[in-house]
Amino acid sequence: MPKRTDIHKIMVIGSGPIIIGQAAEFDYSGTQACLALREEGYEVVLVNSNPATIMTDTTIADKVYIEPLTVESISRIIRQEYPDAILPTLGGQVGLNMALSLAKTGILDELNIELLGTRLSSIEQAEDREKFKELCKELGEPVPPSTTVNTVEEALEFGDRIGYPIIVRPAFTMGGTGGGICNNHEELAKIAKNGLELSPVTECLIEKSIAGYKEIEFEVMRDHDDNAMIVCCMENFDPVGIHTGDSIVFSPSQTLSDKEYQMLRDCSLRLIRALKIEGGCNVQLALDPNSFDYDVIEVNPRVSRSSALASKATGYPIAKMAAKIAIGMTLDEIKNPVTRTTYAEFEPALDYVVCKIPRWPFDKFSKADRTLSTQMKATGEVMAIGRTAEEAMQKAVRSLEIDEKDLYSETAHHASDEEIEQKLVKAQDDRLFYLAEAFRRGYSLEDVHELTKINFYFLDIVSHMVEMEKNIQENKDNLETLRLAKKYGFSDATIATLWNESIDQVRDLRKKNGIIPVYKMVDTCAAEFESKTPYFYSTYDGENESHKSGKKSVIVIGSGPIRIGQGVEFDYATVHCVKALQKMGYEAIVINSNPETVSTDFSISDKLYFEPLTLEDVLNVCDLEKPEGVIVQFGGQTSINLAAGLKDHGIKILGTSVKDLNRAEDRELFDQIIKKLKLNQPKGLTATTHEGVIKAAEELGYPVLVRPSYVLGGKAMEIVYNKSELEEYLHDHVDIAADHPILVDDYLDGRECDVDAICDGQDVLLPGIMEHIEHAGVHSGDSMAVYPPQNFTDEVKDKIMDVTRKLALTLNCVGIMNIQFIVRNGEVYVIEVNPRASRTVPFLSKITGIEMAQVATRVIMGESLAQQGYSDGLAPEPEMISVKAPVFSFSKLADVDSYLGPEMKSTGEVMGSDHTFAKALYKAFAGAKMQLPENGNVLLTIEDKDKEKILPIAKRFARIGYRIFATKGTADFLKNNGLHVDLVTKVHESENADDNILNELREGRIDLVINTMGHDIEKNSDGFIIRQMAIQQNVPLLTALDTADALLTSLENRSFATDALK
């Protein structure tokens, strides 16, 4: 059926900020969908609250609204735009839930707006646990024994009757939010309560656990004419019981017999047809490893995280096809963009193995509960492609950018046998390394299978790699062993360690003997048809399929997996760098390892290499492509860290030189520049021993800011207020050495700001100054920020510009750089310089209209700012005011303290823009899901040092009609200052009393918590327990008084003043 001509304007709802369970894959799918609809001639209106994405670029849709994803906000846009239809199935769970909410308000019926793609009834049938179970019964498809509950009592009755373990799955949530495996009555009571609170419809499915079964996923497509096909089959390394987003995944499936595959394939096709889904969907199935019995776990009636992985694994662009199906086209009339000759109905065939490994945030959150279960905890993922499962897995491990570069872990090596067995039984993020260690110690496949229930085939892969380690070690400099090692994915670095040689010695031996990788094309059809995709992976098997084009080329290094501190913002900058290079006539080549992002869409760059971002893997591509040079400024710290190694091997680094990058990043060299330029800086000292750090802190005087050098996202950065806190910090965090010194800074309390500058060696363009709303001490990534700044005089702005210019020119910056300042009493202090793009680039680019990454790329390639039409200095400020607000994923990470400090904790961001600061704040808070009633109850739990500061804030809350609740110390202080306060008892006082602080939160009597008890970071401290309870109960929580002040500004502008005349 040809595309529909009765609709012309389509609204696409995006997925909002990045949180755990909903990451950059929806930027990728949303971008693809918008472009596909425009390609077919439709006018596209996009609504999304996330400024960090490519999706919210003005080139992606005809109209782009960066507005809160609330019913109120979207309804307003609908009445303004009058779209003919809405496409909600590409914005993750947020988009789906928003479509359901809009439908319930009646606005879609009132304005005769159609929902495209999968019908609402189908979405409800797939998402509503009880309706889905009934459908499976009708189809004769098996599901685990289960019941749907709306109360904790119902859950406990079922659990006690059917027996444990039990799995809790809340309805209409994402990433397993609120769910879990319960082994007894007490665990079920706790998890069911949490799950019911987090489900928007207060409903959970309680089912008998089938943990230990194989977990298989099918990505399925169906069109209006009932054509249906399988895009990809994926198999989880981990058995059922660990969320698929936290599982290692292989594609194609590795252990299914043809009979099992056909049986599960048929089941998936029956389900998508029965649900009448139009577009893409993800079917999760559990297979008993000892029989042909299987159970249906769930169906996601939309594009998902697995769809992005399947798209990159096969080269088949699922979101693009789903968008075209939504407008009435059928699979047999849509061309496959990879081959450009076959049609979309052909099922992809793979002649390689893909391995995905999740990237978890536990390097940031060392005290978090690392146990993996049915609730997702990973922030991102990496993907690697190889000819064997071993090669794919080894490449994926080294793509993770963690301490382990292969299957050897120093921590696992020093663990006792008892600790290793505990790690195998209770899955955590590092279980893979303990599996390898168990095999090194002689555990049999049977022993390890008994402890883990992981399939023998996957255990054999790990065991084989451990055997190969031994083989490599015993055959030093043997060429056959070297060939075999490379075939199975061993890196030069691992081989060098096993041979006790340098990496360059292994590399030289390999190259001298012609042991070099070939690059194979990802073509969707196992080379059956000619393919046009410039999408490649390396292997040491067969013929090379990637050839130099003859055009001048530039390699752009991506930013790797999404993690806290290095998010989708860097992918945004990478994509814009590619666009600028293409406009200048260069062949733009991307190297990246992240399957979720737009930069790894093969249609974005001229050539895509899906490779780990290690020196060896990047050099191999450089050896083949012989580029004009490599750009490292847009891939975050990942690419910057590769610059020196690339230069040492003769590769030209374009833009700021490696020497100057080092001058900005090395503390002592940077201090010399500050002194030479006579600039202000917080006093700081460097130490290389524990004793040296303590001495430095005493010399500067507490509080001090401590951190390692060369880090991103404030990793291991803390404000410490006394010697005992400093000793605990040193014990918890840090390996100190001469080449890894610790920086100790005097902590300055002032107003922080961020600038991104572009310098061509002569002129310096400052697109904007972003003022942080929180005072210094909260990491810039966790601060709310406003542009244009609201509290800086022209004199301060001039000083910032002057200092920026001096630093950019002295550091010989060519391209982009980021500087963070503290403004105190009209003086400007330099905190740090990052000689690369920062996470604020997308936000500033969108609100200033200056495509910063593109302008910087042109500068890097030799085009001056003047030639591009920009002059030296601060760019003119727009009339609109924009606020950026961070978004956190604390509900997914038990035991992570939500108190904000210098170490970054946010996973995403939203933006609010309007003509006044108060309205922009309101939108930013709404986008971050902090919508408060005009009057309600606020709980204040405040440190003594903040008591004076809380008084004006408390008075303002009282004035707009909020009731104030506080514990005795704060309550007495506020009462003495004339305020009415409701007293609550402390955490450990009369715990069962109705007015105990935790009971007040549990019973839903509190609308907002302001808690500044931050230094007490112990898990049993009152401050920590209150913060955890607020997050569990989904109560808005603020830990900085500046944020409370901003929230009040927003609330006051919604409330009427009620002042007596006298």
UniProtKB/Swiss-Prot annotation:
Region of interest (Oligomerization domain), residue spans? 402-546
Q: Which residues bind Mg(2+) 1?
A: 284, 298
UniProt entry keywords in alphabetical sequence:
Amino-acid biosynthesis, Arginine biosynthesis, ATP-binding, Ligase, Magnesium, Manganese, Metal-binding, Nucleotide-binding, Pyrimidine biosynthesis, Repeat
Its gene? carB
Q: Report the residue ranges that make up the MGS-like domain in this protein.
A: 930-1062
What is a single cellular component term in the Gene Ontology annotation?
Answer: cytoplasm
Q: What is this protein called?
A: Carbamoyl phosphate synthase large chain
**What ranges does the record give for the region Carbamoyl phosphate synthetic domain, renumbered to this chain?**
547-929
Subunit composition and interactions: Composed of two chains; the small (or glutamine) chain promotes the hydrolysis of glutamine to ammonia, which is used by the large (or ammonia) chain to synthesize carbamoyl phosphate. Tetramer of heterodimers (alpha,beta)4.
Q: Gene3D superfamilies recorded for this chain?
A: 3.40.50.20, ATP-grasp fold, A domain, ATP-grasp fold, B domain, Carbamoyl-phosphate synthetase, large subunit oligomerisation domain, Methylglyoxal synthase-like domain
Provide the residue positions that the database annotates as binding Mn(2+) 1.
Answer: 284, 298
Pathway, per Swiss-Prot/TrEMBL? Amino-acid biosynthesis; L-arginine biosynthesis; carbamoyl phosphate from bicarbonate: step 1/1; Pyrimidine metabolism; UMP biosynthesis via de novo pathway; (S)-dihydroorotate from bicarbonate: step 1/3
Molecular function GO labels: ATP binding; carbamoyl-phosphate synthase (ammonia) activity; carbamoyl-phosphate synthase (glutamine-hydrolyzing) activity; metal ion binding
Q: Enumerate the residues binding Mg(2+) 3.
A: 820, 832
Protein residues bound to Mn(2+) 3:
820, 832
Q: Please describe what this protein does.
A: Large subunit of the glutamine-dependent carbamoyl phosphate synthetase (CPSase). CPSase catalyzes the formation of carbamoyl phosphate from the ammonia moiety of glutamine, carbonate, and phosphate donated by ATP, constituting the first step of 2 biosynthetic pathways, one leading to arginine and/or urea and the other to pyrimidine nucleotides.
The cofactors required by this protein are: Mg(2+); Mn(2+)
Binding of Mn(2+) 4 occurs at 832, 834
> Which PANTHER family does the entry mention?
CARBAMOYL-PHOSPHATE SYNTHASE [AMMONIA], MITOCHONDRIAL, CARBAMOYLTRANSFERASE FAMILY MEMBER
Give me the comment on cofactor binding. Binds 4 Mg(2+) or Mn(2+) ions per subunit.
InterPro entries linked to this entry: ATP-grasp (IPR011761), ATP_grasp_subdomain_1 (IPR013815), CarbamoylP_synth_lsu (IPR006275), CarbamoylP_synth_lsu_oligo (IPR005480), CarbamoylP_synth_lsu_oligo_sf (IPR036897), CbamoylP_synth_lsu-like_ATP-bd (IPR005479), CbamoylP_synth_lsu_CPSase_dom (IPR005483), MGS-like_dom (IPR011607)
Q: Per the record, which residues fall in region Carboxyphosphate synthetic domain?
A: 1-401
Write out the residues that bind ATP 1. Answer: 129, 169, 175-176, 208, 210, 215, 241-243, 284, 298
Ranges where the ATP-grasp domain occurs: 133-327, 671-861
